[in-house]
């Protein structure tokens, strides 16, 4: 059973293991948390000492561990070599995925993202811009040769953050977007490994320097979750926005007819996308914001 707690450590401390518990110890206190309760461990500072036994047990329990750099930005995460007993079998399937099937599934996933962007613009009152994005959605073709995804993103971000906004800018807005996307990317990467696949082999993403091409492909419909939080806090500092981004771990979202935690949604969504790649008749699940 998956844990439900997100543990954030942001002070000088030592983390160790004893009797199925994570032991947190700093200068003033000691706390114990049973590993079965933990879903995500976010280490926000470099001033933390971990025992190797704890690291081993975190891997055993499939707990997502995210490491931050000296600027408190996500820089790495802990990933096991093998996520399941038949990883070699699933890897052979992944390598043999049909290109036409990959195109169909990638395009379906991107269509969901574009629709979610349009719906969010509409919910913010930008009805004309929302319709423009929907028009781009209706013209989407396999693997998007006309880059309608890019055109939709330009309308979307310029509407939310101004015509002068660019994703290449050095700003608190972009820092917050990147921070939030990295949190979601890490969650998808964990589920991909647990499904027996390699994160490097994507559907369309094929950047040789990107270790998470497949996660980057599958996570696309979920990006507007981060966009909403950043937009609603766009006049706040990066530190304040970052704190609000942590609510993705505790909030529930509607999926498959019920309200669920994001980690559970991502787990189910990833499994079903990979099932659809292995068996195309299964179809891609739908996620709507």
Regions found by a protein language model. Give the residues of each.
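N- or domain-start disorder-to-order transition segments that initiate the globular core
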Residues: 1-33
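Active-site helix-to-loop segments that bind/position phosphate- or nucleotide-bearing substrates
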Residues: 3-6, 10-13, 60, 72-289
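Short low-complexity stretches enriched in small and charged residues
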Residues: 18-25, 64, 139-141, 173-174
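A broad, structure-centric signal for solvent-exposed, well-ordered loop/edge residues
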Residues: 24, 31, 40-42, 50, ...
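A short alpha-helix capping/helix-coil boundary motif
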Residues: 32-35, 166-168
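A diffuse structural propensity rather than consistent per-protein peaks
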Residues: 34, 51, 238-242
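Glycine/small-residue-rich interface belts in oligomeric ring/scaffold proteins
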Residues: 35-86
């Amino acid at each position: 059973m998956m844990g439900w707690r997100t543990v954030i450590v942001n002070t000088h401390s030592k983390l160790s293991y004893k009797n199925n518990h994570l032991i947190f110890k700093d200068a003033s206190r000691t706390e114990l948390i049973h590993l079965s309760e933990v879903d995500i461990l976010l280490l926000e500072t470099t001033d933390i000492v971990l025992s190797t036994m704890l690291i081993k047990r975190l891997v055993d329990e499939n707990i997502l561990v995210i490491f931050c750099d000296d600027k408190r930005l996500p820089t790495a995460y802990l990933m096991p070599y093998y996520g399941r007993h038949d990883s070699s079998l699933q890897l052979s399937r992944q390598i043999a995925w049909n290109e036409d099937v990959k195109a169909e599934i990638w395009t379906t996933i991107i269509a969901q993202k574009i629709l979610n962007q349009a719906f969010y613009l509409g919910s913010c009152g930008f009805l004309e811009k929302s319709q423009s994005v929907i028009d781009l959605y209706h013209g989407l073709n396999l693997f998007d040769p006309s880059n309608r995804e890019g055109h939709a993103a330009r309308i979307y971000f310029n509407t939310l953050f101004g015509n002068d906004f660019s994703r290449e800018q050095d700003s608190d807005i972009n820092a917050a977007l990147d921070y939030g996307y990295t949190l979601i990317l890490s969650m998808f990467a964990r589920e991909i490994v647990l499904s027996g696949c390699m994160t490097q082999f994507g559907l369309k993403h094929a950047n040789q320097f990107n270790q998470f091409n497949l996660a980057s492909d599958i996570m696309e419909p979920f990006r507007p979750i981060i966009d909403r939080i950043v937009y609603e806090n766009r006049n706040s500092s990066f530190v304040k926005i970052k704190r609000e981004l942590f609510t993705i771990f505790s909030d529930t979202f509607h999926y498959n007819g019920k309200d669920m935690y994001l980690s559970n949604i991502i787990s189910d969504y990833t499994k079903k996308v990979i099932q659809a790649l292995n068996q195309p008749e299964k179809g891609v699940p739908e996620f709507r914001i």
